[in-house]
Amino acid sequence: LQETFGYDNLDRLVSVKSGTEETMKISYAPNGNILFKTGVGNFSYNEDVRPHAVTEVENADGKIPGSTLYTSFNDFGKIQLIEDAGKNLRMNSTYGPDQERWSSKLSRNSMDIRTTVYAGEYEKITERGVTREFYYLDGNAIAIREDGTTNIYLAFTDNLGSILSVMNEKGKKVFDASYDAWGQQTVTLNDIDLHRGYTGHEMLTEFDIINMNGRLYDPVLGRFFSPDNYVQMPDNSQNFNRYSYCLNNPLKYTD
């Protein structure tokens, strides 16, 4: 599969072609707001109140779930609750004094589905009654410990650090995934219950969003849920859009 990507004079992604077929088109306002995106349709914003936050999308192709996500944040702007009432799903997150994630708990109808404990590149995940410890090591190695046994796997990533496949010590593929230009993931194999993916971040597939530690990202919209408090590139006008993802150039930058 050969893809070709087009950009405007502000280095923003405006088109994706698969062969000769255009599979995605994106248009922008001068301030970096997405106005149209294939698969979503037209975007609306409130120019008077939070002018960079999406208020409504057309959902032209019906790819956006009809249920509503409720979110709440702590005093430091970190996500502490995600709730999808339509699916009866709820995720609570806790943080340490340095505002690094300590844990998250996913539940449905008050019944626990998955509990995760975080400590840097270590995760302890309890899911379906099974506890696994994940160690993300240098050189794209992943050590997974379960029932006292540790197995070593090798992850293969793209230039952005997105995990494309994982193989075990015998060379057997145990994970396989692909991503569109904005990070929407398609998983075709996952024998190790891996929850990381796009740019190495945690995929919250139950909510169709990505937890990028600091903020939540929607790969369908190509926008963040909350604003960025920092302007890293003050000489770039697009960096003042506090909800845009990577200056609207998702194939070049990571968050």
Identify the residue ranges that each predicted region occupies.
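Short, intrinsically disordered, charge-balanced linker/junction segments flanking boundaries
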Residues: 1, 254-255
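Acidic/glycine-rich beta-solenoid
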Residues: 1-152, 170-174, 188-194
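A motif-centric feature for acidic-aromatic and gly/ser/thr-rich catalytic loops and repeats
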Residues: 43-45, 147-213, 220, 242, ...
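Short, cationic motifs built from Arg/Lys/His that form the positively charged side of catalytic pockets
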Residues: 78, 100-101, 213-215, 223
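Short, flexible loop/turn elements at secondary-structure junctions
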Residues: 86, 122, 202-203, 216
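Short histidine/acidic/glycine/proline-rich micro-motifs that form metal-
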Residues: 204, 231-232
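Short linker/helix segments within small regulatory modules
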Residues: 233-238
